[in-house]
Structures are given as C-alpha cells and as structure tokens.
From Swiss-Prot:
CDD domains: EPSP_synthase
Pathway assignment: Metabolic intermediate biosynthesis; chorismate biosynthesis; chorismate from D-erythrose 4-phosphate and phosphoenolpyruvate: step 6/7
Gene: aroA
Family per record: Belongs to the EPSP synthase family.
Subcellular location: Cytoplasm
Active-site residues (renumbered): 312 (proton acceptor)
Catalytic activities: 3-phosphoshikimate + phosphoenolpyruvate = 5-O-(1-carboxyvinyl)-3-phosphoshikimate + phosphate
Phylogenetic placement of the source organism: Bacteria, Bacillati, Bacillota, Bacilli, Lactobacillales
GO biological process, any: amino acid biosynthetic process
Native organism: Streptococcus gordonii (strain Challis / ATCC 35105 / BCRC 15272 / CH1 / DL1 / V288)
Protein keywords: Amino-acid biosynthesis, Aromatic amino acid biosynthesis, Cytoplasm, Transferase
Identification of the protein by name: 3-phosphoshikimate 1-carboxyvinyltransferase
Length: 427
C-alpha cells in the first residue's frame, strides 16, 4: 500500500487499543480459573484472537460481547483434549505461554503457527519443560513449530535460571509450575515484564518474588476476576515517536499502561530531551495520560537492564534515533533476532533504504542522526511493528513515495492503526 507522506503536523487525542500482553494473559488466567471472568477493553488483534480460539478448542466457553469478554473458566483440570492442532497464528506469546499450560495436562496436543512463527525457536521453553517431565517433539534441534506436547499431570517442580531475559519463558514456566508437585524456583537473568505475576495474584494465586527470584507453589486453584485492560504502551510508542519527530505536532494518549517493567521508552524519550508529560495516573490499573510534542532530540545509549523494559519498542526507537542529533547506541538486544523477524537486520534495512544511517551489530544498532528520509519500497515480512514503524517514518518523507508490502501484518496488534493516523493527521 502507498503510505501517507509529508505530514504537516499531527494533533489530537487518542485511546490506543488494549495491552496485548495483558489481553493474552486475561484469557489464559480466565480459562484456568473457576467461575466467570469478565474482561473489559481487551485487544481484538489477530494474536489475541488466536489465544481466544485455542482455549475454545480446549472446551472453554468464551463470549465476546463487544466491550466485554466473558470467560467461563474450568480450572486447570477442566481443559479438554483438542480435536485438531491448536493454531497460534503469528503469536509467539500464545505458543510459549500455552505450552506451559499444556505441560501439566493429561492429554497431548499439537501447536502450529504461520510461516513466520514456524521459524521461531521454541527450545528456550522446551528445555526446562522437559526437565519437569514433559515430552515435547519439535522440528530440528531448536524445536521449531509444529510442537507436539504430551502433558504430564505429575509434573516435577523445577529450579531454573533463565539464560536470557524473556517474559515469555518465565511465564510458560510459571503456568507449568502452578500444576507441579511442589514449589518451583525461577530465577531471571534481568527483570522482565511482570504481568503474569501481577495477574496470578489478582486471580487468587500465590507466589513470592524476591528481586530476580520467583517461587511458585504447585497444585494451585485460581478464582475468576474482573479485569480492566489498559492501553498498550507498545502501540502508544508509535504515536509518542510521531509526536516527537513530526514538526508542529502535539499528541495526547489516554489510558496508557505504565507498568514499571514496560516504561523504558519513556526513559529513553526523556534522555533524548523529548517534551513528554505524564498525568492522570491510575495506580490500580497502572495507566496514565501521556502527552508529547515536537522536540529537538539528542542521541543516547540504550543497553543493559533497560532493554527488557522496551524490547518491543526498539524498532520505533530506532526511527526516533534517526531524528536525534548525534549517535545513538543500542546494545544487549540480541533478543530482537528471534522476534517475528530478525528485527535488527530488518529495521536497519528498512530505514537505511529510506536514507537513514544505521549499522546493525550482533546485539543492536549504531544509529547516526539527524538524517533526512526519502521514498522507498519496504516489506514488513509479516512483522506488525516493522509496518507501523515504516508508516511513521513515511510521515517525514518530503520527496518520493513510500510503498509498504504486506501492510495487513499490522492487524496483529493494531487493527485501527491507519484510521487513528488519519484522525491525527486531519485535525
């Protein structure tokens, strides 16, 4: 599709769609709890709909009533053996978290995904789950999907130190540990998003967190809850950056999730000198209103424990860095290589084709700014975040056009993205 270019300023207020991570987990916890869980403001992107359909395939009644989703939970012991392969679509979150759920079941199930997901390694979850007594069969030594999981209702507890910072691996192990015969200890490499831990407590579960150590008791029962899903800061990130780099812009985003494990992008914006304000903070839902406006920006360094707090925002942060004076260095982000695409290479290729100066490295990028961007043809390779990054970059292009191939990938997390862009551009 041909993208909007040469924007004269973006102005207005938006409510971004519900948080993808919390939406996934609300369906999983709601299915595993006893009683009817009510979820407000859930994201209706393709990934979350995949999770919803997978639990329906395992016998969970889920009613979508528009603003409200009702999940008739059946407990860990109430799931039914699926009659067909469980299709995770493009969702690595679905596959990894649900693998932990399947680990303790008394049936076998096959998990499949699309072409992109079928290239993503699952050995990071299969190795610890096998240690708990689960039989898992994948493709190649990296356990690429399809994955067949033969559940074990007598799971052994595990003591496991994560070799990488991954909320998905941590969460898979928590879901497995909840079904094990005793207490498990999970030790993080770096602190990652803690939505699973927060929601486990909300649903009446028990765990103890001490720094990077998480202790989870086995054979727990969960109780249905009412969940309000805040807006997704990963989706908000595209408008935050657009508001900073498109001249004559001022954008206000309401009800944005500000869980402390997810707000790394706000730290980066402030370090770069961006004009940003946070107001109307809701301490219960962990949400706030965030306003940004066009700013003079300066390069910075992004590395270490900051990386897990903004891993999904790094593509759009790379664009932000192209519009900052001086050098921006991104390190310790090798996890980007096993996302929907190799995001280090694909981001560099896409933005360099538009005139940026980005050198990909083994674990990140070296970005020189400030650069003028020009027209180009860019392929998403099925990666929603590459698509949205390119659409924001195109707004700065004064000469030439920007063609985006496979733009439909954006529906994975933000079906209304282009409608919201038009709202801001036409004020």
């Amino acid at each position: 599709m041909k993208l909007r270019t040469n924007a004269k300023g973006l102005r207005g207020s938006l409510r971004v769609p519900g948080d993808k991570s919390i939406s996934h987990r609300s369906i999983i916890f709601g299915s595993l709890a006893k009683g009817v869980t009510k979820v407000h403001d859930i994201l209706r992107g393709e990934d979350v709909l995949s999770t919803m359909q997978v639990f329906r395939e395992m016998g969970v009644q889920i009613e979508d009533k528009g603003d409200l989703v009702e999940i008739h939970g059946c407990g860990f012991d109430g799931l039914q053996e699926p009659q067909r392969p469980l299709d995770m679509g493009n969702s690595g979150t679905s596959m990894r978290l649900i693998a932990g759920v399947l680990a303790g079941q008394n049936f076998s199930a096959q998990m499949v995904g699309d072409d992109s997901l079928s290239k993503r390694p699952m050995d990071r979850i299969s190795l610890p789950l096998r240690r708990m007594g689960v039989e898992i069969a994948g493709q190649t030594e990296r356990d690429l999907p399809p994955l067949t999981i033969h559940g074990n209702p007598n799971l052994k507890p595990i003591q496991y130190q994560l070799p990488i910072a991954s909320a998905q691996v941590k969460s898979a192990l928590i879901f497995a540990a909840l079904q094990a015969q005793g207490e498990s200890l999970i030790i993080e490499k770096d602190l990652t998003r803690n939505h699973t831990e927060d929601m486990l407590l909300q649903f009446g579960g028990q765990l103890k967190v001490d720094g990077k150590e998480i202790r989870v008791a086995g054979k727990q029962e969960l109780q249905a809850q009412e969940v309000v899903v805040p807006g997704d800061i990963s989706s908000a990130a595209f408008w935050l950056v657009a508001g900073l780099i498109v001249p004559s812009s001022k954008i206000t985003l309401t009800n944005v999730g500000i869980n402390e494990t997810r707000t790394g992008i706000l730290d980066v914006i402030q370090a770069m000198g961006g004009k940003l304000s946070v107001s109307e903070v809701d301490e219960v839902v962990k949400s706030a209103t965030i306003t940004v406006e066009s700013s003079d920006l300066y390069g910075t360094e992004i590395s270490g424990e900051l990386i897990p707090r903004l891993i999904d925002e790094l593509p759009i942060i790379a664009l932000l860095a192209t519009q900052a004076e001086g050098q921006t260095l991104i390190q310790d982000a090798e996890e980007l290589k096993v996302k929907e695409t190799d995001r280090i290479q694909v981001v560099a290729d896409a933005l360099n084709s538009m005139g940026a100066d980005i050198q990909p490295t083994a674990d990140g990028m070296i970005i020189q700014g400030k650069t003028s961007l020009k027209g180009a043809s860019v392929h998403t390779y099925g990666d929603h975040r590459i698509g949205m990054m390119t659409a924001i970059a195109a707004l700065l292009v004064k000469d030439g056009s920007v063609e985006l191939s496979r733009a439909e990938a954006i529906n994975t997390s933000y079906p209304d993205f282009f409608a919201h862009l038009e709202d801001l551009a036409n004020v």
